[in-house]
């Protein structure tokens, strides 16, 4: 196990099986920055995390048995098993020991004061915000679910995203943790919202010094932990209350109080009600951890967001927003943010459902969420490698349930999107929705050859 107290063995390579995964790529970057030799393997298909890996000079290899050797520490992505990956199969058959991502991380974080961010939605944005503020105040290492990682050997703090899928967060015992919400997702694993709650309740019991949870979530109100639980939100019965909220096209301004103690006014250059909550969670955590509020206030103002969370670009005077939203709750939050920043523009949603199981389980909720847009376009369902399409649901089934104008498009023909004027285009999904986005960008660029 790698710790900062040990002499670095610079000849030992750390090999990541599935290095393009968002958590894996972030961890690879972190260890690379700490001075370790890092490499990894994955499929050839482009994934947005590989830009950072390539920029750092980290080798990305095709999957091959020859990648596995005696002189390395192996970290395997959670999705890779003996029956679907030749490297995992080779390692198991030949006695090579490896750790799963979450197992490695659970041991690694023990050398720091660790701050986790869990929740069904908003983990990545909140982790990014917490890491941004803390790294500008003191030496901080972090892992963010957008594939971003930073490693400093002398860090006091370690900020990380804590994922509930398949209960992967159970090896984690952080000093502090934010939990943004509890909601039913991952129907391929969880049996229902009560099963999700049970997982989060088990995780909460492992937090050591302080738990910060959204007070208006009825499931979060039922959590139990030996650590103090602090509720944040908009209601007077919360421990940390955000109030006097002013939403504008420049972001959100608000005040926070803790009991009778006024913590002051804050600004975050982010949009949507959910981002006020995320910022309040960060403020609460850092206040209890003893961080000076003037410093928190100063660095909240300079947060520029995380990858694939309301990421904006301008192509020929057309605004395109890229977002990872793949659950109805996330879609509503993203469209709310778009309306805050662009109140006078038509909001056009382009959404790709992610996994057949989720689409079946939440079909009506997806339709209701997408009705928050002015117009809707749907891409074909992106199936997970963990499931088989039995033909039980088609994207047209979702289109039929949407009240607003809704059409199905293909990646080869996105020209129907040109029918809108004075519009903002919001591309949402966790699959390959960016292929549709790139097709639209190319179409716009070819119209005037004036890309900026």
Curated annotation (Swiss-Prot):
UniProt keyword terms in alphabetical order: ATP-binding, Cell cycle, Cell division, Cell shape, Cell wall biogenesis/degradation, Cytoplasm, Ligase, Nucleotide-binding, Peptidoglycan synthesis
Pathway assigned to this chain's UniProt record: Cell wall biogenesis; peptidoglycan biosynthesis
EC number, as in UniProt: 6.3.2.8
GO biological process: cell division; cell wall organization; peptidoglycan biosynthetic process; regulation of cell shape
Subcellular compartments: Cytoplasm
GO CC, alphabetical: cytoplasm
A molecular-function term among this protein's GO annotations: ATP binding
Residues that coordinate or bind ATP: 119-125
Gene3D superfamilies reported for this sequence: Mur ligase, C-terminal domain (3.90.190.20), Mur-like, catalytic domain (3.40.1190.10), NAD(P)-binding Rossmann-like Domain (3.40.50.720)
Presence of the UniProt keyword Cell wall biogenesis/degradation in the record: yes
Catalysed transformations (reactions): UDP-N-acetyl-alpha-D-muramate + L-alanine + ATP = UDP-N-acetyl-alpha-D-muramoyl-L-alanine + ADP + phosphate + H(+)
Purpose of the protein: Cell wall formation.
Family: Belongs to the MurCDEF family.
Stated name of the protein: UDP-N-acetylmuramate--L-alanine ligase
Organism: Streptococcus mutans serotype c (strain ATCC 700610 / UA159)
